[in-house]
Amino acid sequence: MAIDVKAIEEHIRGILIALGDNPEREGLKNTPKRVAKMYEEVFKGMCYSNDEIAEMFNVTFEDDLCINDNENDMVFMKEIEIFSHCEHHLALMYNMKVAIAYIPKKKIIGLSKIARIADMVGRRLQLQERIGSDIAEILQKITDSEDVAVIIEGEHGCMTTRGIKKPGTKTITTTLRGKFNTDPIVSNKLMMLYTK
């Protein structure tokens, strides 16, 4: 699905008029075009399904890395910074830090690809809970591992700048699949690494 930049421009122009401003005045002349270009960039992830993202970043290694010697060995990354936009208010979700873990099953994914997946999934109209679920689903497809965990901490503009207006409020969500959900030893190890 392609983003319709021209339609966005027209609608932003209409919003400016609805707000009581003049889209022809000096400061706003190019605003509809700039906003449309920005939306094309920040919502790039909406152009791709989870299957397409999995295909795009499916760069794995199947070396003999002794990854099968201990079935609870895990790959863990944290502090992956992303942003997204709340689908309810189009408000920015910011200061988002993603932690991702998986237990390899015969193949591993390049580390930069994990960060790219998180970034691409964030570039959609989203819920924080769904970001975690989407990342987990994509990693499961690429690695063939059921054992995936995603922890996300972030701030939501819809909570911090409007409505209740509570700046600094952080939301933490977890998506735990496979052993991360069923094996206390694995989940404890995850939490130890996350809080370290």
Swiss-Prot record:
GO CC list: cytoplasm
Alphabetical GO biological process terms: one-carbon metabolic process; tetrahydrobiopterin biosynthetic process; tetrahydrofolate biosynthetic process
Catalytic activity: GTP + H2O = 7,8-dihydroneopterin 3'-triphosphate + formate + H(+)
Binding site for Zn(2+): 86, 89, 158
Entry's Gene Ontology molecular function annotations: GTP binding; GTP cyclohydrolase I activity; zinc ion binding
SUPFAM superfamilies for this protein: Tetrahydrobiopterin biosynthesis enzymes-like
InterPro entries for the chain: GTP-CH-I_C/QueF (IPR043133), GTP-CH-I_N (IPR043134), GTP_CycHdrlase_I (IPR001474), GTP_CycHdrlase_I_CS (IPR018234), GTP_CycHdrlase_I_dom (IPR020602)
Keyword Protein transport annotated: no
EC class of the enzyme, as a word: hydrolase
EC number: 3.5.4.16
Keyword list, A-Z: GTP-binding, Hydrolase, Metal-binding, Nucleotide-binding, One-carbon metabolism, Zinc
Signal peptide from the UniProt entry: none
Keyword Amino-acid biosynthesis listed: no
Gene3D superfamilies: 1.10.286.10, 3.30.1130.10
Pathway where it operates: Cofactor biosynthesis; 7,8-dihydroneopterin triphosphate biosynthesis; 7,8-dihydroneopterin triphosphate from GTP: step 1/1
Family: Belongs to the GTP cyclohydrolase I family.
Assembly description: Toroid-shaped homodecamer, composed of two pentamers of five dimers.
Matching NCBIfam families: folE, PRK09347.1-2, PRK09347.1-3
Name of the molecule in the record: GTP cyclohydrolase 1
Gene name for this UniProt entry: folE
